Amino acid sequence: MTTAGYYAAVDWGTSSFRLWIIGEDGAVLAERRSAEGMTTAAKTGFHTILDGHLAAVSAPAHLPIIICGMAGARQGWKEAGYIETPAALAEIAGRATAIPDVDRDIRILPGLAQRDRRHPDVMRGEETQLLGAAAHLGAGSHLVCMPGTHSKWVRLADDRVEGFSTFMTGELFDTIARHTILSHAVAEADTFAAGSAAFTDAVSRTRENPALATNLLFSVRAGQLLHGTAAADARAQLSGTLIGLEIAGALAGSGSVDGVCLVGSGGLGTLYRTALESQGLNVRAVDADEAVRAGLSAAARAIWPL
């Protein structure tokens, strides 16, 4: 049976692929998910993977496709470039890159670049989440936290990105937990409770004394050796130390901040919400999956109006 639709929306990450068929009323008519991210697609072919998923939901041949994420990277399907900040979110759709020599209309959204020589930064994929999340925020200035392998903190003013900072918190956690002496402290625990005192105490201690971060990291191992800290608590301390360091850096120079928009989902979203609220910050949560779909929808409707 053919799945009718207005367009297909794709979030193509480094190691993940998500596709939604969207109807004219904005409803999700079909969905596909896989681990065929940019790394896989660069070997097997972006067009081949996309066509396979479209065929699996019997998408019509004329259906246009809007894509965000790593498919637009230099190593991706076709480089979509960057929009330089400060930039209005409304510019994103107008700067989409078309894929040539294909039998349907396929566009890839650009990323954002901050070319400040002292604070260079880039994002690709998160700008689409921002576009979707902005509808929930309204006018005024907002600080947006987008947790992930490389977390983004974005300064928004009236739907305009004034600047942003990336923190390698997720990647550092994985590296430290797997490949340093702290691996011995956390190896016996895969998870921990987000609301545990070990986690929130580590967030607070590191935010208060960010210059001591590496000392606090070593104390995770020392605490286990000297006081028998449980592996789950050690893992919570490691995570809390790194997230506390991130929060300290993100809020430095931001002036008085009493609230943060958190664009996240799942366990990671819960973890960051707990961390932020433990620091007395008001959190306005936006689901990350809903935000990326809303951003892709806004771009698609700007490019292909009904």
From Swiss-Prot:
InterPro entries: ATPase_NBD (IPR043129), DGOK (IPR007729), DGOK_C (IPR042257), DGOK_N (IPR042258)
A GO molecular-function descriptor: ATP binding
SUPFAM superfamilies, sorted: Actin-like ATPase domain
Reactions that this protein is recorded to catalyse: 2-dehydro-3-deoxy-D-galactonate + ATP = 2-dehydro-3-deoxy-6-phospho-D-galactonate + ADP + H(+)
Gene symbol of the encoding locus: dgoK1
Keyword ATP-binding: yes
Name of the protein this chain belongs to: Probable 2-dehydro-3-deoxygalactonokinase DgoK1
EC number from the UniProt entry: 2.7.1.58
Family affiliation: Belongs to the DgoK family.
Null mutant phenotype: Cells lacking this gene fail to grow on galactose as sole carbon source.
Signal peptide: none
